[in-house]
Regions:
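Extracellular pro-sequences of secreted precursors
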Residues: 1-198
Length: 198
């Protein structure tokens, strides 16, 4: 993590820090700390049914900050904020720990299964106003097992996935070759691994 942006906001005499990564969003539970997240669209192998995630070689650093600005109810352009959303139970707690890494719902794009990988490299203490940042890390994601259904057929133009799916490569696409998938299912080759280095 090379760094993040911080914009200070004063609400009723309390200074909050609005943190963000360029080009990415934040945690979005209303009233809870809007910590920045990194989101990557990853391709899933046709035969992968179980996802295993491990974080390796993580290096943490601690910083003192103001309270992290809470996520607010989204408003339409014509609406004005009437009430400031804040979870007092969360902000009066010693620690707020979201999942470091999570994978969203599986989707299908041009015949390729994919999902959003979300990384929130923070540990936050609202009471102490301290933030720990995982500034260096390696995320190892492996897929084991097989799906019961046959692999889908790739739609024409799947090369457009290059640049859309962060782990696009020939090995991933080969898992969607129906004949190859059937061959793989007759062997012990049932793992597909890759690393994300932050």
């Amino acid at each position: 993590i090379p760094g993040f942006y911080n914009v200070q906001t004063n609400v009723s005499g309390i200074v909050y820090d609005s943190l963000s990564f360029e080009g990415y969003s934040t945690l979005n539970t209303i009233g809870e700390p809007a910590l920045p997240v990194i989101t990557q669209l990853i391709g899933l192998p046709s035969y992968g049914s179980e996802c295993n995630i491990t974080i390796e070689d993580s290096i943490w650093t601690g910083i003192e900050i103001n309270k992290v600005y809470p996520y607010q109810t989204p408003l339409l352009e014509t609406e004005e904020q009437v009430e400031f959303d804040i979870s007092t139970s969360v902000y009066n707690s010693a620690s707020f720990n979201s999942d470091l890494v999570c994978i969203g719902t599986t989707m299908l794009y041009k015949g390729v299964k994919n999902a959003n990988l979300q990384i929130c490299p923070f540990r936050y203490s609202p009471i102490a106003n301290k933030l720990s940042v995982m500034k260096e890390f390696i995320i190892n994601i492996s897929f084991d097992g097989t799906d019961e259904e046959d692999a889908g057929v790739l739609l024409s133009g799947f090369e457009n996935l290059i640049g859309t799916i962060s782990n696009y490569n020939t090995a991933l696409m080969d898992t969607y070759n129906t004949a190859l998938v059937r061959s793989l299912r007759r062997t012990d080759y049932q793992c597909y691994d890759y690393l994300i280095i932050g």
